[in-house]
From Swiss-Prot:
This is Lachesicidin. GO terms for biological process: defense response to bacterium. Disulfide bonds join 79-90, 101-118. The putative mature sequence has been predicted by AMPA, a predictive algorithm for identification of peptide stretches with antimicrobial properties. The keyword Nucleus does not apply. It comes from the Eukaryota. Keywords: Antibiotic, Antimicrobial, Cleavage on pair of basic residues, Disulfide bond, Membrane, Secreted, Signal, Target cell membrane, Target membrane. Residues 1-22 form the signal peptide. Residues 125-154 have a biased composition (Acidic residues). Expressed by the venom gland. Potent antimicrobial peptide against Gram-negative and Gram-positive bacteria. Adopts an amphipathic alpha helical conformation, that may allow to partition into the target membrane. Low hemolytic activities have been observed on mammalian cells. Gene3D superfamilies: 3.10.450.10. The keyword Nucleotide-binding does not apply.
Amino acid sequence: MQGFFWKTWLVLAVCGTPASLAHRPLSYGEALELAVSVYNGKAGEASLYRLLEAVPQPEWDPSSEGSQQLNFTLKETACQVEEERSLEECGFQEDGVVLECTGYYFFGETPPVVVLSCVPVGGVEEEEEEEEEEQKAEAENDEEVEKEKEDEEKDQPKRVKRFKKFFKKVKKSVKKRLKKIFKKPMVIGVTFPF
């Protein structure tokens, strides 16, 4: 008798639970608002960012169970994060940073997941050009410095020269890697309840 009670209770529990917990439909506008809110809350920036432009997504399906993508542009505002003001009250900074962002919503996950990837506009191409210019300038500067140091170092032992050369390479390598680390795109991933 006791086994029958537990089997019945288990069947009722399974029947009473929805087969899949469907998410609340999310319109394209709501998805953009949520993406901007997530960026402002998780990016760790001092200033708030506001939507500058959104690429229309005619294939956006608010009731989709799969993944959805949206593309948009954010711009830095004059408001600071700690002020906790509404974005509508915040005007854009004249020279504010502009970010190209791509958001991916994964509605098939429980809870749903959003992943944002943002990079400064013109960042990649300009960074490459800046790097090339810096390398040229460094090479020219290095040649001049080397000529001056050669005159001074004629009397120094070879060991000292080798160490200086080695540490110069290490210094350049560290600088280059630090620049790359700090210029990588920002990627944020969060789950959100419906």
